[in-house]
């Protein structure tokens, strides 16, 4: 039993010693398969349609199509980059079917 415990501790020490920021389950790069936006470094797990595999994608830039926050964690259109707002008419049906799409706008610049 002591040998198993020592082997386990050595394995954990080696695993923590490797300074690899890339993740297997979290901190996924763009293009890698994901199950939820929380896994991606960009915080956008995107799929083309209901039958495609979801992959990490960059957030939407200004004047690009976007989605408001979704409960599912997977987007058909990625949310906006930091500092931009997704100008969308939110509906209950759109929230359920994940079809609340809009356009990313910089509201600070739009009011000037």
Curated annotation (Swiss-Prot):
Propeptide regions on this chain: 18-22
CDD domains membership: CLPS (cd23011)
Molecular functions (GO terms): enzyme activator activity; lipase binding
UniProtKB keywords: Digestion, Disulfide bond, Lipid degradation, Lipid metabolism, Secreted, Signal
Signal peptide: 1-17
Its biological purpose: Colipase is a cofactor of pancreatic lipase. It allows the lipase to anchor itself to the lipid-water interface. Without colipase the enzyme is washed off by bile salts, which have an inhibitory effect on the lipase.
The protein, known as: Colipase
């Amino acid at each position: 039993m002591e040998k198993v415990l020592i082997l386990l501790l050595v394995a954990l020490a080696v695993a923590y010693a490797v300074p690899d920021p890339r993740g297997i389950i979290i901190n996924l790069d763009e293009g890698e398969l994901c199950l939820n936006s929380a896994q991606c470094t960009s915080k956008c797990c995107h799929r083309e349609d209901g039958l495609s595999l979801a992959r990490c994608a960059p957030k939407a830039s200004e004047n690009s199509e976007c989605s408001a926050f979704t409960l599912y964690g997977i987007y058909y259109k990625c949310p906006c980059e930091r500092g931009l707002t997704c100008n969308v008419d939110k509906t209950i049906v759109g929230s359920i079917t994940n079809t609340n799409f809009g356009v990313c706008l910089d509201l600070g610049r739009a009011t000037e």
